[in-house]
């Protein structure tokens, strides 16, 4: 069980040890810093330190190989994220040059390409908002459903969002995918 220090300096040192282990991709050191639980790689991290799920933190801060290590150890790529950034959407939201490779890795480890996140968007909705045709192509090839609508606000599909935004490259990919579905 991880003991959270009461004093700010102690919490800062603990956070730094955790953050450094994530950024370096040190699996054993990270497990120890997080208290040594047998399944630390799939348990929410301490709220007091402003941390969420280990896989989400790794998506933002760790080497891609470490993300694979966490997934291979059993970290759930479909973790719940009440802030709206489940794994695929978290990966798409980064400015990492390898973000599409991370999305591919997540999907290869059974991440749901139709997961819901911020604004009830699917990863396709998020890729449209980012104007990322390559992400749309990857998601469609991985089984993402282009007919899904958000269940709030305008209840729109990713295609409707692309049309509204004037994102023709994305709209074209989505139209083509919808026409293949029949």
Locations of regions flagged by a protein language model:
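Ankyrin-repeat-protein effector appendages
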Residues: 2-18, 142, 156, 160-182
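Ankyrin repeat A-helix N-terminal signature
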Residues: 20-25, 57-63, 90-99, 126-132, ...
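Ankyrin repeat domain, specifically the short helix-to-loop turn at the C-terminus of the second helix
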Residues: 32-41, 68-76, 104-112, 138-145, ...
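Conserved positions within tetratricopeptide repeat
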Residues: 31, 68, 100, 104, ...
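Extended repeat-based scaffolds of very large eukaryotic assembly and lipid-transport proteins
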Residues: 1-14, 19-37, 52
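A generic hydrophobic-segment detector
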Residues: 118-148, 159
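Eukaryotic tandem repeat interaction scaffolds
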Residues: 84-85, 93-106
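Ankyrin-repeat boundary/"N-cap" motif
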Residues: 10-18, 43-57, 80-93, 116-122, ...
